[in-house]
Amino acid sequence: MKKTHTAFTEFMQYTALNVLGMIGLSCYILADTFFVSKGLGADGLAALNLAIPVYSFIHGTGLMLGIGGATKYSILKGQKMSCDTNTVFTNTVYTGILAAFIFMAAGFFLSGDITSLLGADRAVFSMTKTYLRVIMLFAPAFILNDICICFVRNDGNPRLSMFAMLTGSLSNIILDYLFIFSLDMGIFGAVLATGMAPVISMLVLSMHWLKGKNRFHLQKTGMSAEMIFSILPLGFPSLITELASGIVMIAFNRIILRLQGNT
């Protein structure tokens, strides 16, 4: 009975801290929406709404790798296979870096085409393109942050994971205000604040390594297709969830643009 009570208490602790952290994580775009609408008006808000689906895709990719890899890590840790846990983390990070560079290349070379595909007209094209390009260039930070958050949480440190997510969100709010209003950086300031948030979050997560609490680390090994394909299905539902919200946003934007235009 005592063991059951302990397991339930631990479960509730992980759940509560994760929910709090995810609420904080959801504030990334919410903060942008508020400050962009106040500082840049209807055109800025339209540009942001058009670009959000791409952010959802990046975030979904990070969650797929993070949740999939961390779940596989927990399974192997429970089986006392500590050598394989390092292989899981290493392959997850390698795959995340590869995916991030694909997003970066698309942002650098195809941001204009993607902006047109999302339905931006002449009035908001420039702002939408700027937001898309910068958010995609920050893809490594978003994806690696998602991976580290999940692994640190499953490594017995859900409190630090939650604190990192909340710190990242709070920094986004502060930087949004600073860049948009104080420094008058416009839409670039909004997306720069959002891109810096996961960097700050990872700095907080680094305490897990600096204090020597980590039970996983990178190791010299090649990418294993077998390992990667055992990780991806575990996190795939998270990608689908983010993609679904992005697709709904694209459909919603197209309907609104057809009926009312940008404003």
Where is each model-derived feature located?
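Short alpha-helical transmembrane segments in multi-pass integral membrane proteins
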Residues: 1-18, 73-140, 182-236
